[in-house]
Every structure is written in C-alpha cells, then in structure tokens.
Amino acid sequence: MSKQLKTSFLDSIAQIAPAEWNKLIGSDYPFLQHEFLLSLEESACVSVRSGWKPSHLIIKNHDEKLVALMPLYLKNNSMGEYVFDWSWADAYYQHGIEYYPKYVTSVPFTPSVGPRICIAPLEDEQAVLTKIISCLQQQANSSGASSWHVLFPEKKLSDQLADLGMLQRTGCQYQWFNKNYADFESFLQSFSSRKRKNLKKERKKIQENNIQFEWLNGHEIAPEQWQSFYRFYQNTYLVRGRSAYLNLPFFLELARLMPDQILLVLAKKDDAYIAGALSFKDSNTLYGRYWGCDEEWQFLHFETCYYQGIEYCIKQGLQKFDSGAQGEHKIQRGFEPVFTFSNHWIAHPQFSAAINQFIKEENQHLSRYQKLAEKYLPYKKNENP
C-alpha cells in the first residue's frame, strides 16, 4: 500500500488549490484552512526570513488523487511555536551539535489544538502515517535537519504517532466548556458563592467605568477599526520590548478571505476605542487569539478576553472557548485545565533517549499539576468536571 503513495513537498500553500486542500481537512477548523495559511505566506509573516520556510507535505495515490496532507515548515529558530524546546537546543549547542534546522508541523504562531495530518476517509491511516514518518526521516537526513515536531495535534493523532515510535509530550491549556447555559447568569450560578461574588465584582467595575463593548464579525470591521485593533495588538508586544509576529496586511487579508470566521471584540470609553480582542470561530469553538489595549483599566483584560467571549459562546451556542496558551488566572474564572499534546522525532539516538526521559518526567509533573489546578476551579463541588 505505502509503495503506491507518492509524496511531494510544496514551497508554498499557493501551489495547491484551496478547494482541494480544504476538502481533505474535512472540518471548518479555521487555522488549517488554505485561506489562513495563504494569508500568513502572502503577508510575509511566514517566510525564510521569519524562520518559517514552507514545505507542506501532500500525498497522492497511483491515480494522482490527493489522499493526505499536512502543514510543514523548515525552521531555523523556535519562535512562535508555544511548545518550548529552547533547553533542547541549548543542550545540542553545548555538545557542539546543530539543533537547527528542524521540521515543524504546526500552524505558525497559533497554540491551538486541531487537525495536523489530514487523511482521506477510506485510506489506511496506519499505512499513510508510516509513510509520512519514513518520508520525514529521510527528508531530515538529506537536509541536515535534527528533528521533526508535530505541535498541538488532536489526541487521536498524537496517540497514533506515539504508537509508531514518536515521543509524546504533554502540555496544559485552559478551556471553557458550555454546559448548556441559558445566559451568563446561569453560568455564574454554577460557581460557589464566593467565586461568583468575585466575578460579579470584576464585571461591575467595568460598568462603573462606563466601558462598553462591540462584537464585530469580519465583514463588519471598518478599516479604522482594524487600525485600532492592530495598534492594541502591537502594544502587547512593545511593552515587552518585542515586535509583533503578525502585520496588518495579514489581518486585512484574513478579513477578505474568511470574514465569517472572525470575531473582533472592541472596548470603547468616551467614544474612543481603548482595547480589543480578536478571536476565530468554527461551528463548535471560539478561539481567543490576540489582545491589546491603549489604556489600562482594572479587569479590562478579563472582560475583553474572557467574559465577552463566554457571553458570545452562550448566545451563539458554541460548545467550547479555547482561550490560547498559558494564564493560570483563567482557572478561577471557569476555564478548565486540559492536556495538549505534541510529538517529536529526534534523529540523534543519544539525544532522543535523553529527551524521552525529560518528557517522561515533565509529563508526570503536568499530570500532578492538572489534578491540583482542578481544585481551584470556581464551580460548586457537584459542578466540577
């Protein structure tokens, strides 16, 4: 079976038709859509210069039918990945070995779990995955890459890759789940009284400061509103002395290509926009991605990024709010700690063994951490997951 499969690497997502790529994805998960990946490339946010050289993998059968695909990048740094391997790179350097370049299967700058290897429904998944692993190992050896990393795959795929010999690493994020809440107040009723009081206090403070909010879908966002949001987004990085990963042309291109999957929350005070949060959505999930502000107000971040998103999910019937990487402060606001996964193939045998041991210890720590973190959820005891 695998001998009949032909692999090809694409220097750009533009080398495959959007309809052909999106059909095989088989879902409306926004970040793997052809339009999203194309916007990253066309805006030059993803390029050799930024450390992300596109090398997307497609597989066709003997009839030239597309049977599998995955995003793939040859990387010369670890920026914008959110699965941190800096210590691995340092260890390589200390031993006089090059860690970069490396291959990464992910969505650039996007720590969101979703499809990573898409396989046609009637294909033998085991055979296709075996072919892909073999292909990437050969490609890494011929190009001098140290490794291949699959970041934020769905658990099923991660387990399949682990069964085929790749290392499996665990991470933790915080997600909100819609338990058929009628409105925000019914969500609050699931809290213990003290936690409910605290959250109401935070929202009341925003109201007392006369801060109001607008929800805008992609086609409703005016150019000047995009300018305001992008200024906020840049501020988030500038306060840390860094430049933003993404540029304004990227966002404008997304608004043109996939407006129905964009939600912009803007905060306004005295007729001026002061903060904003940009999210993406599919039929099931809201994905919180970017935030920033011009003015600092108490609890403004929580309201703009979390409470407005929760309200939107309840009103639109979305089942999950994926709020992105990090942020333990989300726990007491109703976001549950959930495991994320990544898979790794390391070419160097000794380093592979050492990293495997590192991952085992890290996974044990995260398992203990999740159990501890769940104790701090605000829900009444009988509401706890």
Language-model features, listed with the residues they occupy:
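N-acyltransferase acceptor-side catalytic subdomain
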Residues: M1-P385
